[in-house]
């Protein structure tokens, strides 16, 4: 798992450049779960990917600024016919999941009036709602807004429970636009719902006035609570203090703190309306001031200090919990910012008796099991305050659940130490093996890195947990060991770094590298969301689905070869049951030589060949499928960039074969691009084809080659405030900037560019090429490149929105496009009827014809060679909802389409083979509507 492990406000150094307001590299090693580990320089590498080379820093407030700019860019119709300008190749977009794997979740709440209704907030995935106890989820955020959610609160008063609030902005962020390492994820204020979470509007007086600077109290909303006695809305804003609204959020007044003071703040309210607040001593500039714990008995009009004498003088983040059954009992969990000599964090825990005004320091009783720090987190490790959660059982003020990486419980409020010989009396989630030797290292059906714990309001044994993989439920919090259920079905907030499509037309397989959720394998069945399978652990990186083997990798370049388990190559060897064959060259054993998300390339014309960069040199393996591929690596010392450069991206051609493009980046000098002919055999002949005038210090993030013309390529530079998109049509002899309207307008910057794809299509009877660019504000495309006058239009706005499109890949054999987003899972786009891939694709779905297509009032589904006939047919819309269904006990079915809205639908049918086995197929159907 990737994490920035130190507090935000320490000063970091990037090759001698002092960068205020950024993380410094951690003194901790990364957790060593199944090879998890982060190279010490990983934070600097990823920071360099997005920083503005002119300032050496990521621009302040860049998330809000780029979203504001992207909101004014043109959009393509999502799933509709209608071209904006010229021969645009429209795609039918939909989310494919994974349906069963979530992502980082900061906020979770249960509806007090209907406990089957839950609202969840993902760090980069928006607000989601479930009305069936977490069995299924629906996105309720506008897809075009900032999807970073940090807190959710309901008005608990009778007659007001339909009113909800959520806040945005992570000051200790894991934001996808810089992969969470360096810069703060500026929020866009507080949002309110008056229809029980169905729709949301921003509260105008909380919107930051300047999206490019820290000028507003609501840039970083940490916690919202609503008084059950008065309805006043209280907000703990990081870097400022505690605010109150007495008019439902229309106006807010500062009660405690000041702008740029108290970097971390929290607030809690009891059932009787008593307020507790805690403010850090740490300030925004890294210095310290007076912080502590405060109490108000008059709805925030006045506050008294109740800081215990044993509370640390200097402290970073603290969180509060008040016992629901005894409002005079409260607890405070604190990360001080200090590290002990043994490498463990200094975490404090206090019990407060609000009735007597006394407090007890119970820090020494927190879990501290023997074992390595990072195998499972045997103590309360918060990752530098990134992961902290705490709650009190509703019927027992002494039953406390708290966690950092791992989740723990105590039945006496940690008045006594946990029983060392009875691990599962205390350990209830996250990791399960304190020795670090158990390969099943995660607690069953649970996940590490805790962000929220919520008890059922009327069933005190039932508890919900939100963490880095989504949402989990236990029905009996007292059971030993605890039994969890994963409730992330359809909660599509996975954070992908990488996406891959196998080359064959109609292949339904997809592969993605996901942060904290490994390499995920999916099969798209054409309707609804696909189930995902984690075939490799850690932070998933690059991968490939080949003819004979599958390949996956985790952070720092640790690539693996995996067997297929069936003749159809639809089942892949799992890391949980098999020892995977390592394939990376010897340098991969040293994470200091590898990038955090490290690229490799398998030659599309010969899957025996893998290209693997190491710093400024290249390795090649020509017998990747040998019994021991590690014996067949060659270091190509003459295929090298100058000292100080590192190869950051590479891609191999499809036609003509064996042309390799490599991109190299430098901290201060302009990036370099190289081309190598006969890359499968050559050890010489590297040709520099760099972009003239490229910005010094710019980071080459991606290279895309035309699949049928290796002389046409696109270079993607990912830094902010530079020209970052170039094209060549002559093999790199000349480059033309094509960023066009993605560049920004002088007042607002354009988005960071992440990846590109070139997709040749035949559309409406004449050739066209679709160019796609993934950005930090969504996916864009054009069929008309015109240098810096190019007009890029946003794809899939109504489904993908402005999610971070980390990687886009295209398949010319059938025109399919896949996009791995950082926070909204995986999307696929397929050509609408009339648009087919450049390579020939049969217009039948396995012996069945669907006609006419497009259709208006009706369509027929006809079996070409019926054996036992059709069984049933369903029609789904682009978001996977069942629209209509038909029984079809024969070889032909008439589908009544009357009254349907125009658009693209998925027609899915089940049929019975001669053996009696029922199988399923699917095909797109364009309905023209009335």
Give residue ranges: language-model regions.
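A general lysine-centric signal
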Residues: 2, 129, 351, 923-924
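C-terminal outer-membrane/trafficking sorting elements
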Residues: 6-7, 842-851, 855-930
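Bacterial Sec-dependent N-terminal signal peptides
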Residues: 1-30, 838-839
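Generic detector of low-complexity/intrinsically disordered segments
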Residues: 7-12, 16, 244, 356, ...
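Beta-propeller blade termini and top-face loops
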Residues: 24-833
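Compositionally biased non-globular segments, especially hydrophobic aliphatic-rich helices
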Residues: 7, 15-16, 236-239, 707, ...
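Alpha-helical and His/Cys-centered functional microenvironments
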Residues: 7, 11-14, 92, 226, ...
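Low-complexity, Pro/Thr/Ser/Gly/Ala-rich linker/spacer regions in secreted
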Residues: 831-845
């Amino acid at each position: 798992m990737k994490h920035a492990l130190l507090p935000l406000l320490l000063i970091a150094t990037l090759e001698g450049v002092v960068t205020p307001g950024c993380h410094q590299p951690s003194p901790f090693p990364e957790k060593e779960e199944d090879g998890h580990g982060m190279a010490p320089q990983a934070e600097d590498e990823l920071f360099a990917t997005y920083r503005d080379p002119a300032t050496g820093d990521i621009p302040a407030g860049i998330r809000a600024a780029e979203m504001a700019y992207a909101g004014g860019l043109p959009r393509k119709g999502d799933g509709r016919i209608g071209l904006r300008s010229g021969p645009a190749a429209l795609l039918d977009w939909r989310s494919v999941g994974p349906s069963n794997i979530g992502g980082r979740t900061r906020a979770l709440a249960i509806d007090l009036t209907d406990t089957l209704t839950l609202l969840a907030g993902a760090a980069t995935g928006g607000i989601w709602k479930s009305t069936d106890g977490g069995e299924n989820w629906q996105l309720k955020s506008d897809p075009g807004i900032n999807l970073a959610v940090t807190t959710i609160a309901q008005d608990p008063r009778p007659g007001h429970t339909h009113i909800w609030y959520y806040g945005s902005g992570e000051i200790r962020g894991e934001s996808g636009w810089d992969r969470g390492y360096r810069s703060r994820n500026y929020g866009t204020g507080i949002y309110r719902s008056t229809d029980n979470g169905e729709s949301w509007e921003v509260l105008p007086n909380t919107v930051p006035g300047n999206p490019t600077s820290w000028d507003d109290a609501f840039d970083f909303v940490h916690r919202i609570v609503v008084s059950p006695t008065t309805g006043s809305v209280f907000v703990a804003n990081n870097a400022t203090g505690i605010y109150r609204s007495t008019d439902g959020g229309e106006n807010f007044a500062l009660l405690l703190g000041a702008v740029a003071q108290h970097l971390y703040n929290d607030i809690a309210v009891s059932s009787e309306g008593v307020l507790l607040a805690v403010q850090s001593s740490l300030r925004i500039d890294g210095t310290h001031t007076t912080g502590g714990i405060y109490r108000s008995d008059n709805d925030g009009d006045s506050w008294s200090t109740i800081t215990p004498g044993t509370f640390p003088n200097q402290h970073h983040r603290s969180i509060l919990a008040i016992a629901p059954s005894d409002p005079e009992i409260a607890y405070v969990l604190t990360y001080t910012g200090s590290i002990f000599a043994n490498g463990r964090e200094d975490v404090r825990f206090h019990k407060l008796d609000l009735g007597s005004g006394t407090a007890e320091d119970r820090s020494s009783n927190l879990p501290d099991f023997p074992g390595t720090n990072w195998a499972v987190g045997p103590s309360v490790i918060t990752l530098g305050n990134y992961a902290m959660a705490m709650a009190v059982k509703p019927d027992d003020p002494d039953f406390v659940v708290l966690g950092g990486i791992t989740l723990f419980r105590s039945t006496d409020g940690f008045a006594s130490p946990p029983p060392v010989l009875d691990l599962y009396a205390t350990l209830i989630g996250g990791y399960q093996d304190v020795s670090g030797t158990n390969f099943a290292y995660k607690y069953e059906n649970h996940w590490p890195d805790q962000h929220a714990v919520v008890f059922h309001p009327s069933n005190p044994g039932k508890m919900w947990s939100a963490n880095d993989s989504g949402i989990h439920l236990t029905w009996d919090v007292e059971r030993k060991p605890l039994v969890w259920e994963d409730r992330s079905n359809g909660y599509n907030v996975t954070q992908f770094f990488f996406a891959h499509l196998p080359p064959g037309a109609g292949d339904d397989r997809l592969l993605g590298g996901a942060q904290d959720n490994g390499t995920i394998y999916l099969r798209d069945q054409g309707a609804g969301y696909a189930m995902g399978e984690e075939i490799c652990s850690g932070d998933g990186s690059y991968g490939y689905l080949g003819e004979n083997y599958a390949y996956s990798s985790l952070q720092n370049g640790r690539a693996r070869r995996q067997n297929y388990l069936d003749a159809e190559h639809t089942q892949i060897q799992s890391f949980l049951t098999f020892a995977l064959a390592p394939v990376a060259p010897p340098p991969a054993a040293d994470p200091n030589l590898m990038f955090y998300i490290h690229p490799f390339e398998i030659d599309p014309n010969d899957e025996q060949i893998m290209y693997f960069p190491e710093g400024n040199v290249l390795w090649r393996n020509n017998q990747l499928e040998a019994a021991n591929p590690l014996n067949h690596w060659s270091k190509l010392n003459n295929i090298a960039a100058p000292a100080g450069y590192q190869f950051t991206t590479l891609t191999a051609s499809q036609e003509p074969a064996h042309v390799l493009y490599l991109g190299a980046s430098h901290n201060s000098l302009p990036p370099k691009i190289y081309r190598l002919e006969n890359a499968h055999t050559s050890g010489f002949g590297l040709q520099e084809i760099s972009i003239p005038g490229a910005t010094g210090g710019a980071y080459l993030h991606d290279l895309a080659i035309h699949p049928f013309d290796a002389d046409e390529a696109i270079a993607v530079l990912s830094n902010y405030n530079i020209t970052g998109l170039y094209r060549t049509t002559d093999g790199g002899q000349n480059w033309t900037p094509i960023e066009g309207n993605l560049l920004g307008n002088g007042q607002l910057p354009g988005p960071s560019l992440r990846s590109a794809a070139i997709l040749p299509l035949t559309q409406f009877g004449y050739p066209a090429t679709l160019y796609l660019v993934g950005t930090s504000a969504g996916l864009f495309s054009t069929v008309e490149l015109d240098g810096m006058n190019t007009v890029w239009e946003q794809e899939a706005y109504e489904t993908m929105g402005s999610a971070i499109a980390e990687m886009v890949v295209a398949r010319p054999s059938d025109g399919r496009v896949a996009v791995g987003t950082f926070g909204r899972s995986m999307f696929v786009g397929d050509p609408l009827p009339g648009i087919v891939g450049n390579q020939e694709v049969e217009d039948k779905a396995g012996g069945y014809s669907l006609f006419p297509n497009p259709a208006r009032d009706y369509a027929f589904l006809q079996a070409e060679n019926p054996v036992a006939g059709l069984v049933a047919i369903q029609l789904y819309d682009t978001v996977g909802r069942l629209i209509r269904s038909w029984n079809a006990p024969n070889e032909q079915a008439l589908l009544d389409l009357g009254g349907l809205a125009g658009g693209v639908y998925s027609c899915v049918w089940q049929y019975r083979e001669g053996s009696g086995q029922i199988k399923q197929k699917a095909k797109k159907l364009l309905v023209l509507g009335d």
